[in-house]
């Protein structure tokens, strides 16, 4: 051990470093101890991995992914490089010298920038000399790499493989600087599929609607095999999220130039529960009338996003008492307030079988609607009031659908006679004929017995099966077919309809404004609910909620005598009417076994859009006959509350879900294209009445009422 005071000897020999690299160069030329092959244009250049990685971070990243096995070699295919350029570049890495022509200099500098050889990529050709570029702010050259460059592949070859053996000619050269890592014996199929998925990415992002509602397992793990077989793939490819690279064949094609023509109206989507249910029954309809390209479909919005505390448990609820379900408020956000009357559950449940009245009123500023609730009259349980047939209550066609069931089953517009007293009486008939709360399941399947078809057509109630829906019937029509109208025309038509709604009943609207766009020789589709097996024409999209079975009430329903409902049934016209230009209105909700409602009134110029009544002596009928005695209300399930100025649709029993459930309360189209109105019906007792959308006019009278402002 030497003392600290003794001097140290420093010996430096720069020639030795030079000689060592020259010896490595000789080994590289004679392929001694070379463990990597650089291939370009079908020829190979041997090299040492340590030298390449010491001179270039590009090779460092690639070679550390694929270490050569004992006695094996890594083959790097450098696409887009000339073999002469590659040789001169490798010679410079070993000797720090390079002799090139001016044409070759540009190729070598370009290759050096691709391979990130630090001592060469900073050079530039000026005046026939390679000089160092002035150091300043330099761009990050990684972002300037061509993104379309194919990666360099690496594979392990046997030691006996000759370095200068030409490659097969069918291999296409890759762009410069890209790398594909390729293991020996493995093909490039998964990796090319990954690139094809990346090319189809833009097409995948354009697709919309139902394909995104249910992602397939192939989307969630689209290319695990390509990642396992190609673990050292280029970072540009691994940056792509495999969940995005889904096969584009899973999605329907969208014609983009047709999309701006549609008017924004709310559209109901089928719930996932319906898609998975067994199609035990299907909705049957007549497909005799061809589709009209000019018709407009009012889409009804399905309220699916309910808050958890708002969704009741229908399984334990009593038939006539249940907590309120503000399902109409769920979708439009939490900004709407509910009054204390609405919030109070079962506050006054003494009056069973009665329904509170709900009014729709337009606020003066024209921005929103308010729903006004009225307490039911006390004398309705003793003597049901008879509405005034000459009241100022008429419904503009296409603005307020009769019921949720009718909104779903016939999305086309229903036109009513505006100047005839038949309109008011027709609506009274439709309302006073109530629904039976004892029928939890409405199976839209019609029996084919002659007695039912000829004498009393009705909805066959099958209480043993839950309501199921055939998803094959939900094929969506083309966007252009549903909305073959211009935005300006539709806006003006909506404004005219709302102007008539708000101005009172004395002014008759222009008939042309209330007609559907199919008035020029086109015909609105006629829906005949006739027999099983016929699908709704055109695959109209509509949604039904999940159905619940109630075994206790089913047994009561089977034992219930049919004679209790015979009285109101005799006065009602058949549901199915063989009319060429008629449109059958089916009132939603639950039906008594023999109760069916349909009405019609022809009008000049609107025969193909009218509701039909098979017999025209309806105005002469007594309205009291339409409501059975009060003693039978609870048994027959009739709930009627009629006043002289307003009309409320009969409500099915609370706590049960059916196609007319308030979960599917549609939005009414308003004057602006994006304005939507939710209507929720509440009774005074606070219990839920899942009524159909009430067609109630804004009341211009100044009578004192209990008004509840639902919307803020």
Curated annotation (Swiss-Prot):
UniProt record, GO biological process: cell differentiation; male meiosis I; piRNA transcription; positive regulation of transcription elongation by RNA polymerase II; spermatogenesis; transposable element silencing
Q: Name one Pfam family in it.
A: BTB
Q: Where is the composition biased (Low complexity)?
A: 277-288
Major location, coarse class? nucleus
SMART domains named among the record's database cross-references: BTB
Q: Which residues form the BTB domain?
A: 34-102
Q: Which residues carry this modification: Phosphoserine?
A: 420, 671-672
**Compositionally biased spans, kind Acidic residues:** 702-712
Q: What is the recorded name of this protein? A: BTB/POZ domain-containing protein 18
- This protein's gene is called BTBD18
